[in-house]
């Protein structure tokens, strides 16, 4: 049986706070780019666990349409503000569905921010400058937020069925997903003479409670867990027999730069820099290539395009 080529996962770009990442996976057999891309995207958006507030309790408020004397915002506006709160609840301290309470009681005139909330150990507020409410003269804000770890999106009606809902609590919509955006694209890739391969690129943006690369790892684990049932149907087939190593990699990387059809100017610059093989070329990062003497923008673009067309990438800085 023909073995599948083992792909390589490469970090192409990462935000300074690591909540954004762009990644590539290649080479993939034809059809697997969109298969994996769509599966990972849907799992990231729908099944990645996170933390959210699902109910609140405000002294003097019995429902979301209440106005509280001495508080500028009505309860509806306060709820809209709270729904923007970004939380991180430590799963090593709190079990799934274990409720944590964030509290504040203040009569100090002025704005109340998320950072003013009293929080228990193991809970972190990532957007502390988020406005919660504003106290005017003579006002008192007595507020409790109820939050937990879960996954997916639940409406305030769904949350009314939670077992720990008590009289006086107002349920709100809760979005537990830490994923803000996921996009993927599939391009052709080739290794040696094999031209019917694909490269999958993924872009992931999170709310900061999880890094982009951790989000992909968790989503992949969720997918694997769901596929284990199908693997168990026939234990005689080993995954290691299905996916083989890429035996063409070494030969491909040992190709000389003369074999890569560069223009004479680009070829001369690479040779003068001591770069004689494809392996030596991709062992450099993009800045090192760009700093080669007499290598202009046009030549740099030619080299970058050639490396990309081979389904490879420069070393990350």
Curated annotation (Swiss-Prot):
Disulfide bonds: none annotated. SUPFAM superfamilies: C-terminal domain of RNA polymerase alpha subunit, Insert subdomain of RNA polymerase alpha subunit, RBP11-like subunits of RNA polymerase. InterPro entries: DNA-dir_RNA_pol_insert, DNA-dir_RNA_pol_RpoA/D/Rpb3, DNA-dir_RpoA, RBP11-like, RNAP_asu_C, RNApol_insert_sf. Keywords: DNA-directed RNA polymerase, Nucleotidyltransferase, Transcription, Transferase. Residues 1-234 are annotated as: Alpha N-terminal domain (alpha-NTD). Residues 250-317 are annotated as: Alpha C-terminal domain (alpha-CTD). GO terms for biological process: DNA-templated transcription. Its EC number is 2.7.7.6. It catalyses: RNA(n) + a ribonucleoside 5'-triphosphate = RNA(n+1) + diphosphate. GO terms for molecular function: DNA binding; DNA-directed RNA polymerase activity; protein dimerization activity. CDD domains: RNAP_alpha_NTD (cd06928). The keyword Protein transport does not apply. One of its GO terms (cellular component) is DNA-directed RNA polymerase complex. Homodimer. The RNAP catalytic core consists of 2 alpha, 1 beta, 1 beta' and 1 omega subunit. When a sigma factor is associated with the core the holoenzyme is formed, which can initiate transcription. DNA-dependent RNA polymerase catalyzes the transcription of DNA into RNA using the four ribonucleoside triphosphates as substrates. The N-terminal domain is essential for RNAP assembly and basal transcription, whereas the C-terminal domain is involved in interaction with transcriptional regulators and with upstream promoter elements. Belongs to the RNA polymerase alpha chain family. This is DNA-directed RNA polymerase subunit alpha. It comes from Mycoplasma mycoides subsp. mycoides SC (strain CCUG 32753 / NCTC 10114 / PG1). The lineage of its organism: Bacteria, Bacillati, Mycoplasmatota, Mollicutes, Mycoplasmataceae.
């Amino acid at each position: 049986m023909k073995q599948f080529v083992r792909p390589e996962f490469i970090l192409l770009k990462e935000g300074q706070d690591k909540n954004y990442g762009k990644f590539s996976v290649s080479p993939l057999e034809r059809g697997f780019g969109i298969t994996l891309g769509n599966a990972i995207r849907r799992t990231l958006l729908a099944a990645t666990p996170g933390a959210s507030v699902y109910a609140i309790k405000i002294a003097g408020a019995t429902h979301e349409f209440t106005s509280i004397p001495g508080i500028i915002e009505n309860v509806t506006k306060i709820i809209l503000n709270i729904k923007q709160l970004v939380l991180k609840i430590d799963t090593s301290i709190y079990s799934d569905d274990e409720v944590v309470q964030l509290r504040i009681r203040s009569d100090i005139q002025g704005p109340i921010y998320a950072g003013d909330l009293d929080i228990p150990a193991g809970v972190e507020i990532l957007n502390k400058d988020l406005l919660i409410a504003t106290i005017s003269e003579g006002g008192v804000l007595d507020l409790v937020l109820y939050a937990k770890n879960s996954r997916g999106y639940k409406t305030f009606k769904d949350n009314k069925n939670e077992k720990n809902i008590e009289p006086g609590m107002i349920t709100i919509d809760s979005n537990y997903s830490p994923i803000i955006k996921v996009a993927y694209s599939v391009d052709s890739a080739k290794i040696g003479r094999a031209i019917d391969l694909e490269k999958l690129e993924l872009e992931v943006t999170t709310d900061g409670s999880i890094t982009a690369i951790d989000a992909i790892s968790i989503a992949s684990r969720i997918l694997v867990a769901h596929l284990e049932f199908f693997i168990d149907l026939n234990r005689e087939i080993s995954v290691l027999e299905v996916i083989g190593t890429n035996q063409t990699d070494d030969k491909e990387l040992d190709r000389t730069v003369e074999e890569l059809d560069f223009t004479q100017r680009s070829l001369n610059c690479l040779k003068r820099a001591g770069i004689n093989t494809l392996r030596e070329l991709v062992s450099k990062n993009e800045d090192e290539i760009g700093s080669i003497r007499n290598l202009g923008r046009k030549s740099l673009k030619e080299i970058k395009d050639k490396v990309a067309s081979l389904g490879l990438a420069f070393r990350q800085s």
